Amino acid sequence: MARTQVPDPATSAPAERALWLRDELERANYAYYVLDQPDLPDAEYDRLFKELQQIESEHPDLITPDSPTQRVGGEVASGFRPVVHDMPMLSLNNGFSDEDIAAFDKRVSDTLHHTPVDYACELKFDGLAISLRYVDGQFTQAATRGDGATGEDVTENVRTIRSIPLKLKGKRVPKLVDVRGEVLMFRRDFDKLNQRQRDAGQREFANPRNAAAGSLRQLDPKMTAQRPLSFFAYGIGVLDGIEMPGTHSELLDWYHEMGLPVNSERAVVQGAEGVLGFFHKVGEKRDKLPYDIDGVVYKVNRRDEQDALGFVSRAPRFALAHKFPAQEALTKLIAIDVQVGRTGAITPVARLEPVFVGGATVTNATLHNEDEVRRKDIRIGDTVIVRRAGDVIPEVVGALLERRPPDAREFVMPTQCPVCGSAIERLPDEAIARCSGGLFCPAQRKQALWHFAQRRALDIDGLGEKIIDQLVELNLVRTPADLFNLGFATLAELDRFAEKSAQNLIDSLEKAKHTTLARFIYALGIRHVGESTAKDLARHFGSLDPIMSATVEELLEVNDVGPIVAEAIHQFFAEEHNRTVIEQLRAPGKVTWAEGPPAPKAPQGVLAGKTVVLTGTLPNMGRDEAKELLEAAGAKVAGSVSKKTDYVVAGAEAGSKLAKAEELGIPVLDEDGMRKLLEGQTT
């Protein structure tokens, strides 16, 4: 679609700005509804739409019949038969703030002449709206929303969605009903689909919404049948042969009775205070839901009151979509710097013009690695899409190529570490470039010290990041061994470090001198060596010296140590500087641990030789306690599920590990089942 030059909203004439806004919104609609390739974040679309609404309200003569404010969606794609909706599928007006919700409630209550008003609250799914037609209880047709008046016939594709009944059940089945709802894809199903795409060497989907839309609109229903789509009913069109339920909540209950899938995250509340309470409650658990939502929908609950409120050109007056803070937004990429991680990993970081996204102001976002920058074709000066969901680190999703300035510059990975000046190296088979400076690099030094002090490493309480920053910047500590040379007087002089804090840290350091071999190995920060591998090494060799002198072949004999991990361990101990630091750490008066003979080849215990994975929250014990009990029984507790896993112990809010176990047919136990297993009872 042709593009027009972007007029400045501050200086351009309203007619010129409105023309550009209509063009930009229509282009975005086409990409979203027809191509299933949205390239404009929802928040940016909403902002532009609101601006066009404002211009048209101030200048009614600028309203055109084809303005996006006068219609619902996009054009009917070729390849599907058009379906005219007997009752239009309208979209909803949006609210973004508490003030918007209060204003909506006031308009409703003023029109109805009473307060408080009962509202049915439900989730706003991030999927594709469709209409299902049932005649005498039999599913006969499915159509997409399209432009609201005319959609696309996707009947054969929808027949493949297992959650949609082909025949309604119960005693109150109508002669005719158009069920409105949303086709979506659960996150776990989306992850599985993308894994299949990767395995087949095919393009991955950007998000569950794209995957759902693309899957539903496959020309071959057999392709749709292979895609794990789901459906929730939430509205109604034409109804014949039975009386319309008196409230929206009763409508959804009736749907449920007839076997239609209805989401359980819903409630009937009173007034603005009630809907805002529901909104904030849902917002707190949004990231834990198994599917994507982008807000909450409020509908006046009583049907007669809905009829009294009526409709405007594109939306009902009795409903409002309350949108969450956008998880995606547009901003300008000012620069690309690189940061150095604990293991020397060089990560490109986008420096951004400040943008509010995901409930926070974002100025930096990860670009992951050099290959990702190239794949996404991100350049300095671009207008980029930034995504921030929950506590996830903000990332740059992509660039708007149509807004790229002529002077946009490609990113060039530096050849020297920005912190220590050492050479940056990248192995042929790895995506990550790394600083070769090792523990000499101050950036790595800080991260290495922080890792060394972690609770699961040497557990040095009081040695936080700010203290480590001071110790390194004042050149008081260069390696982990230097920590044990620190004295009370030195610590007491640190900025914002009182005498009590200094003494507490001295006590923590003294306590940390007495540890286990496994903790010490983990504390060294060897690449690819986590807690589990550190324990395997300690059990297999019994003492540190054999590990330090082991060949790659000898390391490969350790349980679950593969070629990559074996090579990383071997290279770490082959580096003379690392050996020097280790000798300093185990010098007299420094770190000690109990050493013993190598573990027997076959571990003892009722779970000897078994691999167990923990996931979710157990009701009566923490994960660490469960892990210790399993390991004491001879089990290896792994961090991920594979074909080698013998059992998965799942608690509340178990995630992808549980899904993986079910997919592989691995036995899944709850806490009671785990206890029985520990007692020697088979499952």
Curated annotation (Swiss-Prot):
CDD domains: BRCT_DNA_ligase_like, LIGANc. Keywords: DNA damage, DNA repair, DNA replication, Ligase, Magnesium, Manganese, Metal-binding, NAD, Zinc. GO terms for cellular component: cytosol. It comes from the Bacteria. It is an enzyme of class 6 (ligase). Its cofactor is Mg(2+); Mn(2+). The active site is at residue 124. Its EC number is 6.5.1.2. One of its GO terms (molecular function) is DNA binding. It catalyses: NAD(+) + (deoxyribonucleotide)n-3'-hydroxyl + 5'-phospho-(deoxyribonucleotide)m = (deoxyribonucleotide)n+m + AMP + beta-nicotinamide D-nucleotide. The keyword Secreted does not apply. Zn(2+) binds at residues 417, 420, 435, 441. InterPro entries: BRCT_dom, BRCT_dom_sf, DisA/LigA_HHH, DNA_ligase, DNA_ligase_AS, DNA_ligase_CS, DNAligase_adenylation, DNAligase_N. GO terms for biological process: DNA repair; DNA replication. Residues 602-683 form the BRCT domain. NAD(+) binds at residues 42-46, 91-92, 122, 145, 182, 299, 323. SUPFAM superfamilies: BRCT domain (SSF52113), DNA ligase/mRNA capping enzyme, catalytic domain (SSF56091), Nucleic acid-binding proteins (SSF50249), RuvA domain 2-like (SSF47781). Belongs to the NAD-dependent DNA ligase family. LigA subfamily. DNA ligase that catalyzes the formation of phosphodiester linkages between 5'-phosphoryl and 3'-hydroxyl groups in double-stranded DNA using NAD as a coenzyme and as the energy source for the reaction. It is essential for DNA replication and repair of damaged DNA. This is DNA ligase. It comes from Paraburkholderia phymatum (strain DSM 17167 / CIP 108236 / LMG 21445 / STM815) (Burkholderia phymatum). The gene is ligA.
